[in-house]
Amino acid sequence: MDASTINSLFLIGALLVGASILVSSLSSRLGIPILVIILAVGMLAGVDGGGIIFNNYPTAYLVGNLALAVILLDGGLRTRVASFRVALWPALSLATVGVMITTALTGLIAAWLFNLSLIQGLLIGAIVGSTDAAAVFSLLGGKGLNERVSATLEIESGSNDPMAVFLTVTLIDMIASGETGLHWSLLGHLLREFGIGTLLGLGGGWLMLQLVNRINLAGGLYPILVVAGGLVMFSLTNALHGSGFLAVYLCGLVLGNKPIRSRHGILHMLDGMAWLAQIGMFLVLGLLVTPHDLLPIALPALGLALWMILVARPLSVVAALLPFKAFHGREKGFISWVGLRGAVPIILAVFPLMAGLPDAQLFFNLAFFIVLVSLLVQGTSLPWVAKLLKVTVPPDPAPISRSALEVHITSEWEMFVYRLGAEKWCIGAALRELKMPEGTRIAALFRGEQLLHPSGSTVLEVGDMLCVIGHEHNLPALGKLFSQAPQRGLDLRFFGDFVLEGDAELGAVAALYGLKLDGLDAKMPLAQFIRQKVGGAPVVGDQVEWHGTIWTVATMDGNKIQKVGVRFPEGTRPGPGLFL
């Protein structure tokens, strides 16, 4: 490869990445997932468009694995362990039982539609059987889903790859060797994948945490060290026949949930690297496909994709979530719809090509077609379906920016910047009149371009920008004081006519609103009653019905229900409320 060729590669690569970023601005306007747009850029530049011929499957496999490792590391860093209280076991059930059921149901129809053997059909089912972390993390961000739904989908997408990889590799080996039967030893291989991945992921995350917090480096080197450590865990786990995808996700999870040096610098750089990984991966996968090869299989492939979306995924979700009573029908319906396929199925479809199996090109084209349909149909409709099934909650008010104050190695102090909107009650109030959360301080106040020195007598005006020092747990209280109201089309009465304290006694609540206890303990706290009715770990937005009234979990403090909203039937006149 001479210098001119290398220069051309740099030029083409930079132009494609730049074009993907610029065209991605159409995503929100057209309601099309950004991943579809990037995939389309790759296809348009490929053999049937710009004429770039790319058919190097090992390179695509390399790029895909590297990109997914970075994306999963970033996803783990941003996942809160607190969300595991409501989603860990349901997500693991979906990642194992759900994938197996989806594989079986999809495989049966694939074998029939394309006149393949049963084991070849099951291989297609295994290739497209797992949801994709890149697609889920990208498309669910900012949708305002309740914690039970969002955490379940994110943990599922981060942990279901081992099952899909295991089934794919096993079925490829069986086809290559001419075997037709399954053996119990396969269960041991699966447990080994999960076990080694979990052990090395958690252990590697802990070692990386100690390393980052004990050495002094230039600020920009910590994110690079974290990425390098994540890739070491990914490759080492794969070398030991464990799940590298699971390991790198858990490594990020450990790092993201412990005090760590340069946290915001790490998260900021990983965000950019995750975006670059997604763009590069979907561009390469778009270049890899030959669009005119998809036309002959379009009709049966569309039928298979719709079968998987409308039948296989919903049935697998219902079966996998059967033991978990906290999930109501609307949540199961939404989880069924968000069976997003992305890069993982396309990368898994490269395995048969590299193994030289018959009909391997058909498997690849089918996987690509199903991913395209999934992103277009499911990804495009996510906001509408979430609103229809009522699985969203009003978002917490947020500062316009936040940055870390590295007072010491594991400092958790941050600076939050708020712009005061006209709708905030604090406009016209003096600073001394504000009920600031304990432990927070106003560090600076900007009015226009002028920096003011805030004092107790300073009166707040519309457009003022406040810099507040505090901790992450202060954000809800600060948000009520200073944040701009989010522009969302959610019902302003989402939580009800009144909001009550969770520790209010059931007897007092019943007497206040004229409700019958029907044998319930009058001393029982309202929060405990709601928890029992939910049937599992509650989340903000959970609703239960009691004597025609709707009770909604309004705020949580860890595992504890802090406040509950109550809504009365239309046309009724409620008694006095326990206003907050």
UniProtKB/Swiss-Prot annotation:
GO biological process: cell volume homeostasis
MF-aspect GO terms: flavin adenine dinucleotide binding; potassium:proton antiporter activity
PROSITE patterns reported for this sequence: RCK_C
SUPFAM superfamilies, sorted: FAD-binding/transporter-associated domain-like, TrkA C-terminal domain-like
Family to which the UniProt record says this protein belongs: Belongs to the monovalent cation:proton antiporter 1 (CPA1) transporter (TC 2.A.36) family. NhaP2 subfamily.
Localization per Swiss-Prot or TrEMBL: Cell inner membrane
Transmembrane intervals: 6-26, 34-54, 57-77, 86-106, 108-128, 162-182, 193-213, 217-237, 240-260, 269-289, 292-312, 334-354, 362-382
Protein's UniProt keywords contain Ribonucleoprotein: no
Record field: catalytic activity: K(+)(in) + H(+)(out) = K(+)(out) + H(+)(in)
Gene Ontology CC annotations of this record: plasma membrane
Gene giving rise to this polypeptide: nhaP2
Domain (RCK C-terminal): residue spans on this chain: 402-484
Keyword annotations: Antiport, Cell inner membrane, Cell membrane, Ion transport, Membrane, Potassium, Potassium transport, Transmembrane, Transmembrane helix, Transport
Function: K(+)/H(+) antiporter that extrudes potassium in exchange for external protons and maintains the internal concentration of potassium under toxic levels.
Source species: Pseudomonas putida (strain ATCC 47054 / DSM 6125 / CFBP 8728 / NCIMB 11950 / KT2440)
Protein name: K(+)/H(+) antiporter NhaP2
Membrane topology: Multi-pass membrane protein
Presence of the UniProt keyword DNA-binding in the record: no
